[in-house]
């Protein structure tokens, strides 16, 4: 396993040496996705604002004292996570032309996708900041933990991309499973519902859904001014497991992916 992890690290290192390539490819993806549109990259911002606005109007003030901030931050993180899950499932199939026509490291396509999703999320972030400034939130020392929390989320994203991308390359139905599972996950992840504070199904889903903890390490410092240590423990543990698994999988399958496309 150590040898496989070493190969995975070598592929990742080669991709970072060619970071100008995946930066250029990601920039092209963003430009192409809004080509000949009037609003261009403002669309991700509008989509986010419409989504959050609809939830707040339909659900009212909810059970949280600052429900608007609760939903807006939860939805921001969720949109990033859902993009990572759904786009990763057909990542290498989508990059078939490049993979078959070049000898670039496989990790380049992973980093390209991660950068594209991050740029799109940045536009949504502008909307989240505007909502938070309008609805109000307390400035506390806990806010300092938001940046490292975002870093943890960004570390997990390429690891998921590797694992899901490989699974999707070998099992083409995987992408459809992931799309449908992600739709379900939106409702069993506390994006717009709060901690029930008791047992039952909601309590089980809240505490045992790892996505809860990725959301809470970013959301709780903003909404409650607290640092959720339990969520940090879960998020760091899951991220470490994802990274280790991704490196091993990358080392084992990086040269075999091309033959599955």
Label each PLM-derived region with a short phrase:
Residues 1-261:
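Hydrophobic transmembrane alpha-helices and immediately adjacent juxtamembrane helices
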């Amino acid at each position: 396993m150590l040898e496989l992890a070493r190969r995975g690290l070598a592929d990742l290192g080669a991709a970072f040496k060619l970071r100008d390539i995946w930066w250029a490819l990601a920039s092209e993806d963003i430009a192409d996705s809004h080509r000949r549109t009037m609003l261009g990259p403002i669309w991700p911002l509008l989509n986010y604002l419409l989504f959050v606005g609809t939830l707040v109007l339909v659900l009212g003030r909810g059970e949280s004292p600052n429900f608007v901030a609760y939903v807006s931050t939860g939805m921001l993180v969720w949109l990033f996570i859902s993009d990572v899950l759904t786009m990763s499932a057909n990542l290498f199939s989508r990059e078939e032309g490049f993979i078959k026509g070049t000898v670039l490291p496989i990790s380049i396509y992973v980093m390209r996708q991660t950068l594209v999703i991050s740029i799109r999320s940045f536009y949504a972030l502008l909307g989240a900041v505007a909502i938070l400034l309008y609805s109000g939130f307390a400035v506390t020392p806990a806010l300092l933990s938001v940046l490292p929390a975002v870093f943890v989320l960004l570390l997990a994203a390429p690891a998921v991309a590797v694992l899901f991308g490989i699974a999707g390359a070998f099992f083409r139905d995987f992408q459809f499973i992931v799309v449908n599972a992600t739709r379900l996950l939106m409702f069993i992840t506390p994006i717009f519902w709060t901690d029930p504070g008791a047992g039952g199904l909601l309590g089980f889903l809240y505490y045992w859904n790892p996505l809860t903890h990725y959301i809470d390490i970013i959301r709780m410092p903003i909404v409650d001014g607290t640092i959720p240590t339990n969520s940090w423990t879960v998020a760091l543990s899951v991220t470490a497991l994802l990274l280790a698994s991704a490196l091993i999988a990358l080392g084992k399958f990086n040269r075999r992916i091309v033959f599955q496309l």
